[in-house]
Amino acid sequence: EDEVADNGKDDDENGYTDDVNGWNFIGGADGKNVDNDTFEVTRIYARLHPKYENADTTNFTAEEQAKYERYKKVENEYRYQINNKLQQYNNIQSLEQSMQRGDEILTDYFGGSYSYEELQELQAQDQETAFAKNVMTYVQENDIDSTLIAEQKKQLYEFMKYGYNPEFSPRDIVGDNYDDKSERYYGNPDVAGPDASHGTHVAGIAGAVRDNGLGMNGVAANVLIMPVRAVPDGDERDKDVANAIRYAVDNGAHVINMSFGKSYSPYKNVVDEAIQYADENGVLMVHAAGNSSENTDETENYPTDTYGDYFEGTTTANLWLSVGASGWKPGDEFVGEFSNYGDQRVDLFAPGVDIYSTIPDNKYKRNQGTSMAAPVVSGTAALLMAYYPDLTAAQVRSIILESVKTYPNLKIIIPHKADAEPTEGSFEVLSVSDGVVNVYKAFQVAEKMSN
C-alpha cells in the first residue's frame, strides 16, 4: 500500500522496488523478461548427460548406481518427449494438408461454401469425395480451423526450439545467482511480461468484475488480484516458485492460486520450505492437478503438499487443495480427458473444460485445463473469506471439501493417454472428496460453521 509506482524506490521497504501490483521473478532489473524456457526434464538431462553419456558403471557404488538409473529415467523421458512432439507435429501437418484438400474438393462440389447439414446429406459417389466428407466432418465436429492448426504448430515448434533444447538457457536475462537458492531479491515489477494470456484468463475466472455486462462473471466479487510472475513458456524453476510463494505470503495474500506444474523438481526442498512457510502463516494454497491424464498417486507431479520424497514423505501441508478438471458433458465424458486425478493426491474437481474468461486487450476466450479449474476453487475460497472473515483458512478448506457435489453412481472414462485403451471407472475414485466444488452448498456449510 505504501509503494509508489515507477519512482525507482522501494517505498515500503519490502525489498522489491515499484511492486505496486506484484512482482516478476523471471525478469531482469533492466526490464527484460524471460518468455520461453526449457522444460525441467531438459535441464536435468543437460546437466547430467556429460557426466553419464559414456560412464563405465562397472564399479559404481549402490548410491552411484541409483543416481545413474535416475539419469537413465530422465534420458528416456527426454527422448520420448522429443519423439512424441515430432510425431504430433507431423500429424498436425498431415491434418492441415487433408483439410486443405478436402475443402477444395467440397467447395468445388457444392459450388461454394457448405454447411455441416449439407455435408451430412452428401452421398459421396467416389473415394475422393468420401475422403473429403470424412475429413471435414471430423474438422467441424471438433471445432478445428486454420487458426487452431497454426497455434498448435507454433507451440510444437517452440517446444522443440526452446523447451527440449539442452543448449538453450534464458537465465542470464534474470541476472540472479541461480545457484543460490536462498536468494530472494531479484526480478522486476513487470507482472504482465511478454504474454499475460494465461494469467489473465486464470485471474478472470477467480475474480473478474461481476454483473457489469461485459464478457463474463468471475466466481468472486471485489477480490484483489496480486499477480506474481514465476512461470515462463516452459517449466517454472523451483527457486522462482519458492520465492513467488514467499512474496505472496509476505505481501498479504489470503489465497495463492497455482495454475502450473511439472513432473520433476530437482530443488524440491526449497519449494517445500516455502509451502511450509505459507502453511504456517495461514495462507490457503490451491494447485492445478495437471493436464497429463495421469494418476498422480502413481506419477510425480510438482509442486505437492507432501514434504520430502514424493512417494515416501509422510508429512503434508494442511492448507493445500489440488484440483482436477470436470467438464460440462454428461455421462462418461464428465471429466476432462486431459485431467490428472488421484484418490489420495487430488482433493476435488472443478469446471475446467471450455471455460470462457478474460484475456489481454479487453478480449475473451475459451480455454481448458486444470489451470482453469483451480481458480474456480480459489474464487470460492475468496468468497467464503470475504463473507465470513472469522473463518480460518483451515476452516475454509474444510468447508470446500465437505460441500462438494458428489456423483455416487456416475461411471466415467478414466483420463488416459491418447495411445492407451479407454477404461471405464467410478468418478468417486478420482479424488479424495469424490466430488465437484459447489459454491452454494459451501455457503450453507459456512453459515453453520461461522455461527
Residue ranges and their predicted role:
Residues 28, 167, 283, 305-386, ...:
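Extracellular S/T/G-rich loop segment that most often corresponds to the catalytic His/Ser-adjacent loop
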Residues 193-196, 217-220, 235-257, 266-287, ...:
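Mature extracellular/periplasmic domains of secretome proteins
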Residues 191-203, 290-292, 364-377:
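Gly/Ser-rich catalytic serine loop of serine hydrolases
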Residues 229, 257-261, 288-289, 324, ...:
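A cross-family glycoside hydrolase active-site/sugar-binding cleft signature
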Residues 249-251, 255-258, 269, 316-322, ...:
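C-terminal subdomain of the subtilisin-like protease fold in secreted/lumenal serine endopeptidases
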Residues 30-31, 212, 231-235, 261-265, ...:
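Solvent-exposed loop/turn segments at secondary-structure junctions
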Residues 1-237, 311, 315-319, 341-345, ...:
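Subtilisin-like serine protease catalytic core
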Residues 207-211, 246-250, 254, 276-283, ...:
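Sec-exported extracytoplasmic/periplasmic mature domains
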